[in-house]
Amino acid sequence: LLWLLLLPTLCGLGAADWSAPSLACARGPAFWCQSLEQALQCRALGHCLQEVWGNARADDLCQECQDIVRILTKMTKEAIFQDMVRKFLEHECDVLPLKLLTPQCHHMLGTYFPVVVDYFQSQINPKIICKHLGLCKPGLPEPEQESELSDPLLDKLILPELPGALQVTGPHTQDLSEQQLPIPLPYCWLCRTLIKRIQAMIPKGVLAVTVGQVCHVVPLVVGGICQCLGERYTVLLLDALLGRMLPQLVCGLVLRCSHEDSAGPALASLPSEWSPQESKCQLCMFVTTQAGNHSEQATPQAIRQACLSSWLDRQKCEQFVEQHMPRLQTLASGGRDAHTTCQALGACRTTFSPLQCIHIPHF
């Protein structure tokens, strides 16, 4: 599924809200290198690795990143993997609560799944991806590395077989004519639902461990730091791209859906595979991150809704929220980043190491 995960890189920076707020990143290296999450948000990972966290040579980082991308690409090009994803999505179409949507779901899947797969498999370029992450030096773009999607592709992805109302940018729910279906048919909701189901099935921890095994070049001071880096930032990127940008961009291309109902930060700094002793910090950062995108008035409701996330222990989350709600609300609306907020609450260690490894069980 890397051809979908890496869509933001191929589409250019204007296609999605990838970066952290510009004012925060404008603080410079002191802000960028506080954590891996912030380094990724500000596209300063290469700088932090070379200048702050270790003595990595730029060329080595670039090569290591490209190796990681190639491994993930190879994994996702396997026919058995694609068949598994296709069957999974077909099953999701079959179990939709509103059975009237099932035929349209299968139609959308059958028509556009192969189009998206074929295009992005042919467009994966490790060098471009690693430049976007700040791990390869920027240079003059080569003609075949244009990041903008071509007009012919857009023509293929605007659902020409469906009513004209679906072919223009507009509300995120569009209707078929009353003659075809007597109720509104939310194609964009359907698209996002299927992609979120894919998100839930991907074993991010297993992928991260596989990525960590390719580390053999980077000569950082601390032994094993490359494997740690590979494991940790792979999980972070998968969470970020699958959680927000993948639904936005794929559904935006296929259905021209608007981004009005997008919620949550571009980079959710919460891999579910963190070790048990970090669970309180993890929970706090997730809740705080979810609340950070809302107005002060909407923050309490956003904090409570965060506990409904499928991977959280709901009871522990609600207990945490009840215990910390007044102060959490004040800190979350004060413009601090999630980790700083949770340090202030005592949920996260103040001696946080940006390159602290995660512990993932081997399967």
Swiss-Prot record:
It is found in: Secreted, Extracellular space, Surface film. Residues 18-58 form the Saposin A-type domain. Keywords: Disulfide bond, Gaseous exchange, Glycoprotein, Repeat, Secreted, Signal, Surface film. One of its GO terms (biological process) is respiratory gaseous exchange by respiratory system. Glycans are attached at N293. InterPro entries: SAP_A, SapB_1, SapB_2, Saposin-like, SaposinB_dom, Sphingo_Act-Surfact_Prot. Residues 17-180, 260-363 form a propeptide. Residues 1-16 form the signal peptide. It comes from the Eukaryota. Disulfide bonds join C62-C136, C65-C130, C93-C105, C188-C257, C191-C251, C215-C226, C281-C348, C284-C342, C307-C317. Residues 58-140, 184-261, 277-352 form the Saposin B-type domain. GO terms for cellular component: alveolar lamellar body; extracellular space; multivesicular body. Pulmonary surfactant-associated proteins promote alveolar stability by lowering the surface tension at the air-liquid interface in the peripheral air spaces. SP-B increases the collapse pressure of palmitic acid to nearly 70 millinewtons per meter. Homodimer; disulfide-linked. Pulmonary surfactant consists of 90% lipid and 10% protein. There are 4 surfactant-associated proteins: 2 collagenous, carbohydrate-binding glycoproteins (SP-A and SP-D) and 2 small hydrophobic proteins (SP-B and SP-C). This is Pulmonary surfactant-associated protein B. The gene is SFTPB.
